[in-house]
Every structure is written in C-alpha cells, then in structure tokens.
Amino acid sequence: MSRKPLIAGNWKMNLNHYEAIALVQKIAFSLPDKYYDRVDVAVIPPFTDLRSVQTLVDGDKLRLTYGAQDLSPHDSGAYTGDVSGAFLAKLGCSYVVVGHSERRTYHNEDDALVAAKAATALKHGLTPIVCIGEHLDVREAGNHVAHNIEQLRGSLAGLLAEQIGSVVTAYEPVWAIGTGRVASAADAQEVCAAIRKELASLASPRIADTVRVLYGGSVNAKNVGDIVAQDDVDGGLVGGASLDGEHFATLAAIAAGGPLP
C-alpha cells in the first residue's frame, strides 16, 4: 500500500520559545499548504517551546503538527522532572519520541522503559515514534539487522497488535547521528524492510503494511529523495537540518515528490 511520508524535525535541546515561534513561522512561510496533501510534517521541540508552538499552530490554523521529545511512563505523581503524556496531549501534541539513541546512551534507557513509554503514549492518544539503531561496531561486525530486530521486539513488548499499528518506528544508526555520515539508501532499506517483516510477525502483515518506518541520521535535502524512494522507508526523523526553516521545508517538499517550493 501507499503510506504517506512523515518528515519529523527533532530540535533536540535547541531554541528557546521565541526562537521556536520564528522557526515555525519560517517553515509555514516556506512550505505552502498544497504539500501537506502528500507529506505529513511535524516539529519536535523541547518541552519549554510546546505551548508557544501550540498557540501559533492553532492561531494561524497551520497544517504543521508537533510533538515532544520524551515522556514519563507515569501518568502523574511524585516524579520530579518527568512530563506526563496527559500534559502533552492537553498541549495538542500528535507525536512523542521514545527510545532515541541519546536517551538510551546518556540516560541509560533500556528497551523495557521504552516499551513502557510507548504504551503510555498510546494510552493518552499520542503516536510514539519508537527509535532503534546500532552503533558502528555492530554495523561493522555485520550484526546490525539482528541487533535492530531484537531492539524492536523489546521496545514494543507488551503492545497488542492493533496498538503496534498506531506506532511509528524510526531506524537511526547511531554512527550516523550528527556525524555527517549517512547510511546509504540501500542500507536504510535493508534495515527498514527487516523492521516491517518483524512487525508483520509481531502484529500481522496487514498492520505492518500500514506502519510508517522512518530513517534518521544526518538526513538533509540532498539525500532525502533517495532515502524516501526506498520501498520500506516512509520518511525521516531529521535532526540538525530541521533547525533551518527553509532547508527543512525544502526537505519536506522533496519527500512529497516535489516540485521545490
């Protein structure tokens, strides 16, 4: 089936709420409404920017969507520093990233916690973008496919088949994040196809055919066309390139099939 591409811009820990407003305005100005019929576009700002982004998106009736970079596995309570999925839903978030390699690396998040966060996101009507990916040593040893499938199983553990159908998955080879190194389109397809095959096993072929599988890792306007042209790659989780509104809009337009805005 034909899956609508998703281009999600992960701002990471960049931009205050004033800068967030300016960036969303730039994206909205640079990417006319007609493109949104062929590509879904989302921004993933820091928590502190979400209310400002919500106000702008709602006030100007933008077709851009937005989400958060993480959430708590808990709904409420004495969890200092955590942010509840209920709060994110109230802010109008559509997506939430879980299991990003930077969370796994710097905060020691494991697959069990990622699965708990994914379940909590779904409980609150949010679409989790579940991230998996290998380090360079795993890739060089030729174990990257097996590694990603094991990580996928752990990160979706406990979800029902229909819940899996409401998830977005993102393959982000750790060695390609912020390094300028990019997996080739064929490399991305290899792992994303394996992900879809495993989703068919975990849920069903029908459900697997509907799940969007993204690629993340130094995605930009120069390489996104080749990446999304692959049969099993349905968009990109974009890092640094999402901080330039005009570049991000161009990238989204290419993913939509063009022409450039």
From Swiss-Prot:
Pathway: Carbohydrate biosynthesis; gluconeogenesis; Carbohydrate degradation; glycolysis; D-glyceraldehyde 3-phosphate from glycerone phosphate: step 1/1. SUPFAM superfamilies: Triosephosphate isomerase (TIM) (SSF51351). It comes from the Bacteria. One of its GO terms (cellular component) is cytosol. GO terms for molecular function: triose-phosphate isomerase activity. It is found in: Cytoplasm. It catalyses: D-glyceraldehyde 3-phosphate = dihydroxyacetone phosphate. Substrate binds at N10, W11, K12, G178, S218, G239, G240. One of its GO terms (biological process) is glycolytic process. Keywords: Cytoplasm, Gluconeogenesis, Glycolysis, Isomerase. Its EC number is 5.3.1.1. Gene3D superfamilies: Aldolase class I. The keyword Cytoplasm applies. The active site is at H100, E172. Its main location: cytoplasm. PROSITE patterns: TIM_1, TIM_2. InterPro entries: Aldolase_TIM, TIM_sf, TrioseP_Isoase_bac/euk, Triosephosphate_isomerase, Triosephosphate_isomerase_AS. Belongs to the triosephosphate isomerase family. Homodimer. Involved in the gluconeogenesis. Catalyzes stereospecifically the conversion of dihydroxyacetone phosphate (DHAP) to D-glyceraldehyde-3-phosphate (G3P). PANTHER family: TRIOSEPHOSPHATE ISOMERASE. This is Triosephosphate isomerase. It comes from Mycobacterium bovis (strain BCG / Pasteur 1173P2).
